[in-house]
Every structure is written in structure tokens, then in C-alpha cells.
């Protein structure tokens, strides 16, 4: 088992890591947090020659794109053991990346795709069915789980674990070799024939015999709704709101729930379509593969049925309840001949619309737009503050093209920094600047995180730049974790997901591919960062210049420190925590500090001076004491309104005495 983390499925790898010692190892199951999706997909190669089951996971189409080389080879050669790919379908309102469908990837490589109903019990069943389907058709199988389903909570009934016949505890004794499983001509031609003559027909038989898709008959026999299994909850909820379904999903409208959306089973779908006049396809995203296939099947079978889909909903975007209810209403009103039914549906829809208007009127103002931002104390923020200060103070040097990358640091493209002219993929920032760099009259900057560096950046970025003698600057943000996915381990962490030491560092890797100009800077030292960036951009030395900005992810740091601090405070030990503030009598309300910082803990409050109308800066209680606000004010030569205090828990006698003396002196010098 393995995979690469990415929302919305990252926590699955956390669960596997937590279960490694207590469950996986005793069963002889191997687990790894892979270096990339391609490495994870290659794990499934074990199932090509041996009856070994394997499961991997990653994020959406972007993960599948990275994995596609290895995955296409596995799908071509075929598998003996069940091979399951669990994909977090990152599509819609909560998505963090490209809006594309796994369905297209499944069609490209002839990989069966499961999209089951979004219930925990259904997921448990279809994991088992997924392995069975894979072994029945000798192909890997995609198992798609949507964003909201990835965050469900609940209970389910499980069955006992079955110890695998081949495992780390029952190892193989001899290798298996067959030229027919090597992806080389002429065997690739035979593999292609097997896909369509044997494997996909076997998949259809399994889907039909095991009843993976669900047909729910209804009294309105002339109508029908075909949907992806993952949209069952939303569709039935929409029917319920229109008065056409109860809370258990019983409805007079016949339903076909496609838990397996590729390959489709023609006889199953034709059996549903026969005798119907109007059928609606509820399919999220484009291209509308299901709608097209259904129309083609009906046309070839010469069925007199009108099939609709996207014209009732939207050609793009997530099918949220409001959109689905509206689409169902349009379809049912146009398809139902009885005036009584139409009136009832329209009345329910009008009541829903009126309720939304009441809610909208209850909100005095629209919810404020809040762009994504760095966390409080994030070590990546000061790096972009330094870039912005350099660009402002010395535009002839600092005002240059910046190739951004995937990660937390992508937020640099947002206000207040607006640093980053392009984002092309994970670890691809440096490679994306290869064509831009020769066209500029100054050096360009590329940015990547340590996660992106180890994933793709070292080979496709750094090695490519060295090979092509690129003269530019690379900034690597080394925060010791793949933080954007949830602080997962990478080689910079020092240990892997199994807590084993790695012995890998970014400087070692850079020197290994020939980089000689390497500078390491504390992320929070803004003046030094500005100076180092200026040196990298102006030095006469040709070739790639790398600036490594080191600073631990603040979220992970606080998770580690706060329990220790609470324990020490409870034990009566003295604990000192730095905090920063803004002197309200000094701050003029200029807000330059915010325009160069953007810290969530740095906010606004009313000025105590009645002659100053503008609100002043204020540091709230979420401050973690990183000091970036003061560093920015100093480096940018801003106002001197920032101050640092120390919050002391369980102060000793000497500390209390000094505090009393200070208060006495201050009171004498500045009487009330």
C-alpha cells in the first residue's frame, strides 16, 4: 500500500501510517508514503506477475497525470492480483486545483471506474468489490471519492481481516517471468486486443453479476433518472425537496444508480431505457461521457426515448443541491403531463426560492471575500515580504518574472504580495521559467517548496536547468514537511512515514547535480534574505543560483510545542513566550506593515486618538511571536510602532522583583 498525499484524500495515508505497526505489519502488508504519484503507481507493478493485491491513493486528476506513465503500463500489461487506485476527486466549490474528471483518464487507459454512493457502508463494500473487479478483468481499478464524501463521519459494519497468501510474512520464493507481460512489441499489440476482447467484457460481466449498479423502479414508468453513484445523495435530496422522494430515497421516478461508471453495461442500461419517454442524466463535470454513451446506445437500439442532461443543469462546476433542485424541477415540469403534478412541483420550488430570499435578506451584507493566505507565523510569508520589499526598493533588480509553484507558497500570488506570474505544476516552477529566462534583461526567479523539490523539482527543474545551463535564481522554501497536504513527511523531514531516518538533504541533492552557488538563509531573517536575493540576482557568476529559505512549518511547530508548554506550566515551571504588539499612540494608520506582511494576526482596530480617523494596526491573541511584523517594519523602514513583550507563566522570585521595580520606575517617570 502506498500513495502521495493531496486533498481531499490526504488523511487516508495518515490512517495507514497510524495502522502500520498495529495492523499492517502483523498482516505482512507493506506500506510506504511514496515520493510521488508515479512512484505510488509503480507499486502496482507487483500485481503484474504475482497474485498480490495492492492499493494506492492520490489527489484527483493532477495525481493521475503524474502517475499516468506507470499506470498506463500497468493497465496495458494487466494484473493478476487486485490493484485499486483510490482517488480524491478534487472537483467543484471546495477544490484546490484543476477542474478535470477522472472519468476521462479511465477512458483513455481502459481502466474500470467506480463512483459509489456516498455512504460509509457503500465505500466499505466497494473497496472489496473493487479488488474483485480488478482480479476478474485483470485491470487496475479506479475508486473515486468526492470532496465532501472524503470528510464524512459515521459508523459502518466491517468484516474480519484476511491474511494475504503472499506478504512480507509469507514471501515469494521464486521470480515469475513472461515476455507476454513486458510492454514491448509485438506483445503490446496483443495486450491492446485483450483489453477490448477479454478484459472490458469481463469487467461488464462482473458488474452485472455482482449487481454493482442499482435499478430502483417507480410508478412513473415513462420517466427515468440515470446518475453517478456519487451524486445519489444530492439527487435524492433534490427530489425530496420537490416532494417526490422520502428521506429513505423512495420515489415514484425510476432511478438507475451507476456505482460503476466505466465500463457501462449496454444490456443493463437498455433494459432501463426501454419503455421510457424522457430520461435525465445527472452527471457532474465535462465532458459529459455518460450522457453521450447513453444517447449512442439508445440510437443504436432505435429506442424512442429523449435523453437530456447538461441543458437542465450546468456544463461545468460542482452539482450542489441548489443547482440539482433547479435542474430536476425543469426536467420534471417539462416531462410530466399532469397539471396537478406540475403545480405541486412548482409550489414546492417557489417555497424553496422564497426561503432563500428570506435568508439572503437576513444577512445585512454579503459575506466578505477572504482570499487564501499564509498561516500566522508561516516561515514562507517573510520570504515573499523580502521579495516585495526588494521589488519596491530596487525595481531594476527585484521587479522580475517570478515562476510560482504548487504548495502553500502559491498563496504568494494573492494579496498583499501578488508575487508569481505563473503556476504550471508541482515542482515545475523552475522548468516553467526555462523559456522565460532567456527573454528577460534580468535574471528571473523560480520558487518551489521542499515537497515540490523532492517530488518533481529536482529532476525536471534543477537537473534540467543545469543541463541547459540556465542562468536564473531558484528559491526553495524548506519547511521540513509537505505542508500543503497536512504536514506529511518528505526527505527534508529527516524520517519517512514509518519513522525511519532518511539521511537526505536538499544541499546534498543540489551538489549532486552540479549546483555550486547555494545559500541557506533563515526564513525569518528578512534583511539577510533581501541581501541574499540581491546577490543572487546581480552576481557575475553564471548558472543556477539557489537560495534555500529554512524555517519549520509553524503549524507543526505549534503542535509540538504547545503540549510541552502546557505540561511545563502545569508542573510549575517558568515558561516564556514572546508576543508582539502595536503601540496605539505611535501607529498612524498607514497600514504599510499589512501591505508587506498579510499576517492573519495583524488586523485593525479603532484609533484611540479622536483626531485620527483611520483605524490603526493591531496584533491579536493568535500571535505566535515569529517577529515578522517587526522585521518587515524595520527592513522596509516603516514606523517604529511595533514592540515585543514576553508573556511569563510561573515567574520566579527574581522575575517578580524585577517586574515590580520596572513598574515603579515607569510609574514615577510617566504618572497618570
Task: Indicate where each model-derived feature is located.
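Short helix-loop-beta junction
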Residues: 15-23, 109, 238-254, 508-514
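A glycine-rich helix N-cap at a beta->alpha junction
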Residues: 21-33, 76-88, 167-175, 467-480, ...
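Short acidic, glycine/serine/threonine-rich loops at helix termini
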Residues: 11-15, 43-46, 66-70, 93-101, ...
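Thiamine diphosphate
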Residues: 1-120, 148, 218-221, 226, 413-545, 556-559, ...
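Intrinsic disorder at enzyme termini
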Residues: 571-583, 635-672
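Conserved thiamine diphosphate
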Residues: 90-140, 146, 172-187, 361-362, ...
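Flexible, low-complexity linker and terminal segments
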Residues: 117-380, 523, 534, 541, ...
Amino acid at each position: 500500500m502506498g500513495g502521495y498525499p493531496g486533498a481531499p484524500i490526504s488523511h487516508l495515508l495518515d490512517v495507514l501510517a497510524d495502522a502500520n505497526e498495529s495492523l499492517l505489519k502483523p498482516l505482512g502488508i507493506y506500506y510506504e508514503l511514496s515520493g510521488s504519484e508515479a512512484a505510488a503507481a509503480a507499486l502496482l507493478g507487483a500485481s503484474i506477475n504475482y497474485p498480490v493485491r495492492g492499493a494506492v491513493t492520490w489527489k484527483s486528476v493532477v495525481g493521475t497525470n503524474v502517475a499516468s506513465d506507470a499506470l498506463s503500463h500497468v493497465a496495458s500489461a494487466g494484473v493478476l492480483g487486485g490493484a485499486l487506485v483510490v482517488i480524491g476527486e478534487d472537483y467543484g466549490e471546495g477544490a484546490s486545483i484543476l477542474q478535470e474528471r477522472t472519468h476521462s483518464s479511465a477512458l483513455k487507459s481502459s481502466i474500470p471506474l467506480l463512483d459509489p454512493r456516498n455512504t460509509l457502508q457503500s465505500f466499505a463494500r466497494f473497496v472489496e468489490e473493487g479488488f474483485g473487479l480488478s482480479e476478474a478483468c485483470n485491470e487496475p481499478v479506479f475508486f473515486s471519492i468526492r470532496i465532501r464524501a472524503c470528510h464524512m463521519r459515521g459508523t459502518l459494519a466491517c468484516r474480519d481481516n484476511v491474511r494475504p497468501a503472499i506478504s512480507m510474512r509469507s514471501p515469494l520464493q521464486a521470480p515469475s517471468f513472461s515476455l507476454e507481460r513486458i510492454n514491448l512489441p509485438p506483445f503490446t499489440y496483443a495486450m491492446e486486443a485483450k483489453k477490448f476482447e477479454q478484459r472490458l467484457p469481463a469487467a461488464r460481466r462482473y458488474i452485472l453479476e455482482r449487481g454493482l449498479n442499482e435499478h430502483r423502479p417507480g410508478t412513473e414508468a415513462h420517466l427515468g433518472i440515470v446518475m453517478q453513484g456519487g451524486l445519489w445523495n444530492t439527487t435524492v435530496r433534490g427530489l425530496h425537496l420537490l416532494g417526490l422522494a422520502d428521506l429513505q430515497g423512495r420515489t415514484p421516478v425510476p432511478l438507475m444508480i451507476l456505482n460503476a461508471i466505466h465500463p457501462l453495461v449496454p444490456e443493463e442500461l437498455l433494459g432501463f431505457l426501454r419503455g421510457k419517454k424522457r430520461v435525465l442524466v445527472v452527471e457532474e463535470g465535462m465532458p459529459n461521457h455518460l450522457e453521450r454513451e447513453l444517447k449512442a446506445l439508445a440510437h443504436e437500439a432505435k429506442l424512442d426515448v429523449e435523453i437530456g442532461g447538461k441543458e437542465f443543469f450546468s456544463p461545468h462546476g460542482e452539482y450542489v443541491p441548489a443547482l440539482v433542485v433547479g435542474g430536476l424541477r425543469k426536467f420534471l415540469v417539462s416531462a410530466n403531463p399532469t397539471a396537478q403534478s406540475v403545480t405541486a412541483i412548482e409550489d414546492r420550488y417557489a417555497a424553496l426560492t422564497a426561503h432563500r430570499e428570506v435568508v439572503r435578506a437576513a444577512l445585512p451584507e454579503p459575506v466578505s471575500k477572504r482570499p487564501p493566505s499564509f498561516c500566522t507565523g508561516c516561515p514562507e510569508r517573510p520570504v515573499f515580504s523580502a521579495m516585495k520589499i526588494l521589488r519596491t526598493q530596487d525595481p531594476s533588480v527585484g521587479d522580475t518574472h517570478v515562476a510560482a509553484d504548487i504548495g502553500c507558497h502559491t498563496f504568494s500570488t494573492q494579496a498583499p504580495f501578488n508575487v508569481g506570474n505563473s503556476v504550471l505544476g508541482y515542482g515545475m516552477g523552475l522548468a516553467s521559467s526555462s523559456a522565460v529566462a532567456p527573454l528577460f534583461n534580468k535574471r528571473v526567479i523560480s520558487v518551489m517548496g521542499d515537497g515540490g523539490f523532492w517530488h518533481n523539482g529536482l529532476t525536471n527543474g534543477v537537473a534540467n536547468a543545469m543541463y541547459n545551463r540556465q542562468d536564473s535564481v531558484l528559491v526553495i522554501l524548506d519547511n521540513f514537511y509537505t505542508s500543503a497536504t497536512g504536514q506529511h513527511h518528505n526527505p527534508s523531514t529527516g524520517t519517512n512515514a514509518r519513522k525511519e531516518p532518511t539521511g537526505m538533504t536538499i544541499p546534498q541533492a543540489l551538489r549532486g547535480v552540479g549546483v555550486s552557488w547555494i545559500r541557506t538563509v533563515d526564513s525569518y531573517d528578512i534583511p539577510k534574505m533581501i541581501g541574499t536575493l540581491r546577490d543572487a540576482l546581480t552576481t557575475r557568476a553564471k548558472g543556477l543560483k539557489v537560495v534555500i529559505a529554512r524555517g519549520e512549518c509553524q503549524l507543526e511547530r505549534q503542535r509540538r510545542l504547545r503540549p510541552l508548554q502546557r505540561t511545563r506550566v502545569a508542573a510549575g515551571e517558568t515558561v516564556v513566550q514572546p508576543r508582539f504588539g502595536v503601540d496605539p499612540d505611535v501607529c498612524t494608520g498607514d497600514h504599510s506593515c499589512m501591505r508587506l506582511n498579510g499576517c492573519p494576526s495583524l488586523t485593525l482596530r479603532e484609533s484611540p486618538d479622536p483626531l485620527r480617523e483611520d483605524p490603526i494596526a493591531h496584533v491579536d491573541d493568535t500571535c505566535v511571536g515569529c517577529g515578522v511584523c517587526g522585521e518587515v517594519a524595520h527592513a522596509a523602514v516603516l514606523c517604529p510602532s511595533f514592540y515585543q513583550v514576553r508573556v511569563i507563566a510561573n515567574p520566579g522570585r527574581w522575575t517578580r522583583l524585577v517586574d515590580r521595580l520596572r513598574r515603579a520606575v515607569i510609574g514615577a517617570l510617566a504618572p497618570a
